[in-house]
C-alpha cells in the first residue's frame, strides 16, 4: 500500500464526498474543497453530507473547507462536473503547485470543444506540468460509503504513476486496477451515460428485458467504435470503465442518466426531469457532444443519434426506437 499523503478533493458532490471518505479511511490527510459553507460545516461537525448523501456517515477524519488554499496539496482529486471543469480550472489555476498530481473523477465530453477532461486539464494547467490520471468504473457513491465491494480502473500515461495511485485508492472494499489508456477510460465513462439514457427510455416504455439486453450489447459496440476513432484501445471497452460501467448505469435505478431515460419513456419533459433531479446527469449534455463527435469522425452511432433526437429534437421515444428496429439489416 502507498505511504500516507496529503490530498485535496475538489468538489463536494456525491462522488467527491465518497472518494474523500475512502481516502480518509485509508489513513490519508484529506480535505474536501467545496463552495457551500453550510455543507462544509455539517461535514466537519456531523460527518455527513446532507445534500448529496444524507444518512450515510463519513469518516470523522475527513475535513471540509471552502478555502482554496487546500488546492496546493500534492495530490488533487478533480470531482468537478465535466461541463464546469474548464472555467473552474481557469479560476483556480493559481492555487495549484507545479507538478501537481491530478486524478480526474468526472465523466463527460465538453460541449463545443468536444474535449475530454484530460484535454481540458492540459489546456488550462499545461504550464504547471501536472501529472494526470483518471479514475472510472462502476461505482455508485452510496455503495462506496457502505463499504460494499467495488472495483474501478485508474488510467495514466505514466505507468509508474498509475501503479502508485492504485495503491493510494485501494482498500479492503475498493479495488483499483491500473491502465495506460487514458483516452479509452475517459471515453468509456462519457459514452456509457448516453447508453444509460437509451436503456432507461426502453424500460420507461415497457419494452422488456430483450430490448434492454440488445441495447446494452449494441451500445457497447458503438462505444468501442467511437472510442477507437478517438484514439482509444478497443479492449479497454471490455473492462471496468466500459462494459462494467455500462452494465451498472443501464440496469440500476440509482443511475441518474437511467432515471432521465425512464422518465422520458414515461412521457415526462426533459426540462422538468433535469430541474427535479437535484444532481447533474452528465449524459444529457454529453449526448450533444458525442453526436457532434460521431459526425465529425464519420462513425456510425445510431443509439447516440436516437438519444439526441429524443433530447434535443423532441422526437417521440416510441417513434425513435421503432426507427432503430427498422434500420437496414447487417452483419453483427
From Swiss-Prot:
Compartment list: Cytoplasm
GO CC entries: cytosol
Residues reported in the UniProt entry to bind NADPH: 14-15, 35, 107, 141, 256, 280, 282
Active site per database record: 192
Biological processes, Gene Ontology terms: carbohydrate metabolic process; glycerol-3-phosphate biosynthetic process; glycerol-3-phosphate catabolic process; glycerophospholipid metabolic process; phospholipid biosynthetic process
UniProt-listed InterPro entries: 6-PGluconate_DH-like_C_sf, 6PGD_dom2, G3P_DH_NAD-dep, G3P_DH_NAD-dep_C, G3P_DH_NAD-dep_N, NAD(P)-bd_dom_sf
Keyword Protein biosynthesis found: no
Pathway the protein takes part in: Membrane lipid metabolism; glycerophospholipid metabolism
Residues the record lists as binding sn-glycerol 3-phosphate: 107, 137, 139, 192, 245, 255-257
Catalytic activity entry: sn-glycerol 3-phosphate + NAD(+) = dihydroxyacetone phosphate + NADH + H(+); sn-glycerol 3-phosphate + NADP(+) = dihydroxyacetone phosphate + NADPH + H(+)
Domain of life: Bacteria
EC nos: 1.1.1.94
Pfam family of the protein (one): NAD_Gly3P_dh_C
The keyword Cell cycle is assigned to this record: no
Swiss-Prot/TrEMBL keywords: Cytoplasm, Lipid biosynthesis, Lipid metabolism, NAD, NADP, Nucleotide-binding, Oxidoreductase, Phospholipid biosynthesis, Phospholipid metabolism
Enzyme class: oxidoreductase
An example Gene Ontology molecular-function term: NAD binding
Known role: Catalyzes the reduction of the glycolytic intermediate dihydroxyacetone phosphate (DHAP) to sn-glycerol 3-phosphate (G3P), the key precursor for phospholipid synthesis.
HAMAP family for this protein: NAD_Glyc3P_dehydrog
Recorded family membership: Belongs to the NAD-dependent glycerol-3-phosphate dehydrogenase family.
Protein name per UniProt: Glycerol-3-phosphate dehydrogenase [NAD(P)+]
Organism of origin: Desulfovibrio desulfuricans (strain ATCC 27774 / DSM 6949 / MB)
Gene: gpsA
